């Protein structure tokens, strides 16, 4: 908050209350075949999910400012209160347990309510969760803002202390438990910034620490096997995760010369990061997951950005962005019956570069772009295959003012990937997107027709590498689409007295 002229102290209060009532009903046909196990091993499930949920949240905050004369120092004590009450049911019904409701049953159909409520309830995976959260945060901040030399020095130190109490009432199969957990955490924040040369140049250093609380349900002795190939367990020994982040940045901008430069370095490390250990059973093909705390995860990243006008009339413009990142990812991976070290550490180095050139003539604009990034992932694991892969893209963009007030935005880009061990990840996809729009009715109403992946080259299946160097597959039901937008702009001016 900027200091109002002639004011030495100020107070501010705010708050809100929010209520949500949601209900979701889902149907699922699931078939698991095990050909290696012989005949009669097919597992078919006709499932119906009913998941109503109610949430009420409330928040209040009081801030107080006090400026210490002309010293440049100001004090800001504050208090925040946040509360929430969440009640959720997850009712699962195995309809195939009724005669005539197997694989031949109509998808999305339900038998009589009495039949499926009494005879098909999946008590082992259904649950009722009622959780209340009370959170108090006391913060004391010191700020400094003053002219120093030929520039301006700003500094900030925040010392928030958070007191949290959570109460969970949980019912599931043989479990009916009510318990509470209290937590106190300290999350300091600090920032120092110096601006000079009429605020066009600056250097900034910041640090903050934050605590993430584990989910209370994760600590329960619960087995979830709704997906028979992915079983989830609980862990009563979980600890809260603590993240440390630090950053250093420098900027040098010249509006007169149309040159902009920035560079930065970021570091983050997590202690007791909450992840899931995985154990694979080769005989059954089942993965068993369990929440655990892991240490050793950190990220170091750097970036350099530069843009400039290439000619005196500033019609040609060039921009570049360079990024470099080092990830150290630690996870717990085991195989049933194996003697290998379950701790899996993967180091990934990422280097990326993006270059764009634009030409503008009046209200018309065309551009060319080129992007490339290289990824190298290594691990001491015996079963790990080193990753040396590159993603690159190149294309053209355009923004045109057409007759009759129409505007056209278009983008034609080739996306390519090379060097992946999984051949399905080495792809070339030419993607064309366009948007045609027009403003009418004194520019209050905008009509726009948008087309995404007009050439239908994008695959509905996306393959990515996670932090452990493993391939993850995602499916998009609608990779290509067309959409009509109708946007009305409403401006209500206050009446003059």
Regions found by a protein language model. Name each.
Residues 1-497:
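Primarily recognizes Gram-negative and organellar outer-membrane beta-barrels
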């Amino acid at each position: 908050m900027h200091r109002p002229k002639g004011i030495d102290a100020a107070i501010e209060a705010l708050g809100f209350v929010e209520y949500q009532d949601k209900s979701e009903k889902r149907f699922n046909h699931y078939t698991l075949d095990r050909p290696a196990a012989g005949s009669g091993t097919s597992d078919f499930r006709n499932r119906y999910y009913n998941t109503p949920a109610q949430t009420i949240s409330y928040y209040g905050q009081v801030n107080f400012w006090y400026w210490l004369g002309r010293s440049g120092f100001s004090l800001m004590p504050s208090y925040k209160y946040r509360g929430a009450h969440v009640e959720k049911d997850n009712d699962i019904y195995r309809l195939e347990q009724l005669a005539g409701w197997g694989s031949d049953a109509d998808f999305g159909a339900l038998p009589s309510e009495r039949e499926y409520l009494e005879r098909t309830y999946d008590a082992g995976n259904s649950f009722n969760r009622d959780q209340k959260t009370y959170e108090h945060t006391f913060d004391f901040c010191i700020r400094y803002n003053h002219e120093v030399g030929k520039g301006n020095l700003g500094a900030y130190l925040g010392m928030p202390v958070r007191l949290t109490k959570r109460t969970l009432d949980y019912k599931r199969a043989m479990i009916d438990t009510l318990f509470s957990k209290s937590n106190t955490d300290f999350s300091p924040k600090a920032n120092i910034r110096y601006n000079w040369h009429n605020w066009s140049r600056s250097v900034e250093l910041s640090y903050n620490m934050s605590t993430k609380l584990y989910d209370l349900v994760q600590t329960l002795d619960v087995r979830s096997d709704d997906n028979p190939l992915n079983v989830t367990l609980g862990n009563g020994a979980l600890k809260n995760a603590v993240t440390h982040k630090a950053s250093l940045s420098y900027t040098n901008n010249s509006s007169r010369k149309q040159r902009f430069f920035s560079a930065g370095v970021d570091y983050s490390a997590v202690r007791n990061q909450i992840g899931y250990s995985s154990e694979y059973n080769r005989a059954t093909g089942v993965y068993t997951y369990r929440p655990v705390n892991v240490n050793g995860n950190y990220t170091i990243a750097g970036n350099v950005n530069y843009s400039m006008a290439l000619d005196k009339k500033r019609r040609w413009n060039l921009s570049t962005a360079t990024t470099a990142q080092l990830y150290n990812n630690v996870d717990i991976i085991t195989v049933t019956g194996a003697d290998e070290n379950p701790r899996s550490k993967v180091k990934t180095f990422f280097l990326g570069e993006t270059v764009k050139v634009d030409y503008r003539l009046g209200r018309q604009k065309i551009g060319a772009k080129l992007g490339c990034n290289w990824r190298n992932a290594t691990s001491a694991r015996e079963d790990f295959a080193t990753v040396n892969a590159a993603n690159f893209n190149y294309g053209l963009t355009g923004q045109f003012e057409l007759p009759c007030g129409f505007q056209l935005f278009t983008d034609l880009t080739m996306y390519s990937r090379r060097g992946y061990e999984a051949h399905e990840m080495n792809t070339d996809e030419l993607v064309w997107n366009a948007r045609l729009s027009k403003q009418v009715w004194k520019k209050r109403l905008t009509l726009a027709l948008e087309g995404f992946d007009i050439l239908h080259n994008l695959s509905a299946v996306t393959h990515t590498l996670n932090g452990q160097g493993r391939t993850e597959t995602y499916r998009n039901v609608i990779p290509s689409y067309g959409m009509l937008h109708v946007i009305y702009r409403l401006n209500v001016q206050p009446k003059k007295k």
